[in-house]
C-alpha cells in the first residue's frame, strides 16, 4: 500500500521540479573523470609558460629600454644645444651693448665737432675771412700709411672743422716778425716770449729806488690806476660803524728816503 502511494506521488511530480533554480549551475560530473580537460589545460599552461612567452617579454622590455635611452640622449642633446644658444645670445648682447655705447660716443663727438665748426665759422665771418674761397692743405693719416697733402677747395656745407682751423695760421705766418720763435717750437717758445714782458712790467715799480722822487710818484700813480681806488675815498658804512676798540692798530709806514 505504501509503495503504491509513493509511486503515485512520484507520478504527480513534474520534470520541472528537478531543474536548478535561476542563477545557479548544475554540478555535473566531468567526462571521463576529468582527465581530458585537465590534460588540455596543462598543455596550454605549459605552452604559455614556456620559452616563447619569456622571450617576447624580454624583447618588449629591451625595446622599451632602448626607447628610453634614445629619449634620454635626445634630451641631453637638446639641453646642450640650448645652453650653447644661450651663451651665444649673451655674447651677441654684450657685443651689441658695446656697439651701442660706441655709437653714442660717436654721436657726442659729432655734435661737439658741429658746435666747434659753427663757432669757427661765426668767428671767421666776424673777422671777414674769406675761408669759403680759399684752399687748404689737409693731412690725411691712415693706419700704417704716410700722410699725403691733398689740396681741396673750401666748402661751407661739408667742410670739417680741421679745414677751418688751419686758415688763421696760414694767414698770420707771413706777418710774424723774425725775432719771434717759429710756430713749430710749441709752448716752450711762448713761455720764453712771455718772460721779457713780465720783466718789463716790473720795471716801473722798481724805478723809484733808482731814479728818484719823480719816478716814485709815477710808480705810485700806476699802482693806483691798476687797482682802481683813490687815496681820499670814503670807507663803507660797515667800516665806519665799528668802534675804535674793534679796529686793529697798524703802525704807520715810513716814507722812503729821497735823495
UniProtKB/Swiss-Prot annotation:
Cross-link entry Glycyl lysine isopeptide (Lys-Gly) (interchain with G-Cter in SUMO2), positions: 222
Main location (coarse class): nucleus
UniProt keywords, alphabetically: Apoptosis, DNA damage, DNA recombination, DNA repair, Isopeptide bond, Nucleus, Phosphoprotein, Transcription, Transcription regulation, Ubl conjugation
One cellular component term from this protein's GO annotations in UniProt: Ino80 complex
Compartment(s): Nucleus
UniProt-annotated stretches for the region Disordered: 51-72, 141-210, 240-259
Tissue note: Ubiquitously expressed. Abundant in the brain.
InterPro entries reported for this sequence: INO80F, TFPT
Pfam families: INO80F (PF24245)
Protein name: TCF3 fusion partner homolog
Organism of origin: Rattus norvegicus (Rat)
Amino acid at each position: 500500500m505504501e509503495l503504491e502511494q509513493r509511486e503515485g506521488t512520484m507520478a504527480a511530480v513534474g520534470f520541472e521540479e528537478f531543474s536548478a533554480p535561476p542563477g545557479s549551475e548544475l554540478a555535473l560530473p566531468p567526462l571521463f573523470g576529468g582527465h581530458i580537460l585537465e590534460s588540455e589545460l596543462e598543455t596550454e599552461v605549459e605552452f604559455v609558460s614556456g620559452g616563447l612567452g619569456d622571450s617576447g617579454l624580454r624583447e618588449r622590455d629591451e625595446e622599451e629600454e632602448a626607447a628610453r635611452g634614445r629619449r634620454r640622449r635626445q634630451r641631453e642633446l637638446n639641453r646642450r644645444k640650448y645652453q650653447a644658444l644661450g651663451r651665444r645670445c649673451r655674447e651677441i648682447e654684450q657685443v651689441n651693448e658695446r656697439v651701442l655705447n660706441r655709437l653714442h660716443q660717436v654721436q657726442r663727438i659729432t655734435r661737439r665737432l658741429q658746435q666747434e665748426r659753427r663757432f669757427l665759422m661765426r668767428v671767421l665771418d666776424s673777422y671777414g675771412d674769406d675761408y669759403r674761397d680759399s684752399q687748404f692743405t689737409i693731412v690725411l693719416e691712415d693706419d700704417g700709411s704716410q700722410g699725403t697733402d691733398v689740396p681741396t677747395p673750401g666748402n661751407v656745407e661739408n667742410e670739417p672743422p680741421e679745414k677751418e682751423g688751419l686758415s688763421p695760421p696760414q694767414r698770420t705766418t707771413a706777418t710774424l716778425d723774425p725775432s719771434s720763435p717759429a710756430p713749430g717750437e710749441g709752448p716752450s717758445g711762448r713761455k720764453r716770449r712771455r718772460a721779457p714782458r713780465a720783466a718789463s712790467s716790473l720795471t716801473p715799480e722798481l724805478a723809484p729806488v733808482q731814479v728818484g722822487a719823480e719816478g716814485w710818484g709815477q710808480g705810485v700813480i700806476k699802482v693806483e690806476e691798476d687797482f682802481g681806488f683813490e687815496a681820499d675815498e670814503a670807507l663803507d658804512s660797515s667800516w665806519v660803524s665799528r668802534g675804535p676798540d674793534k679796529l686793529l692798530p697798524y703802525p704807520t709806514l715810513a716814507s722812503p728816503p729821497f735823495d
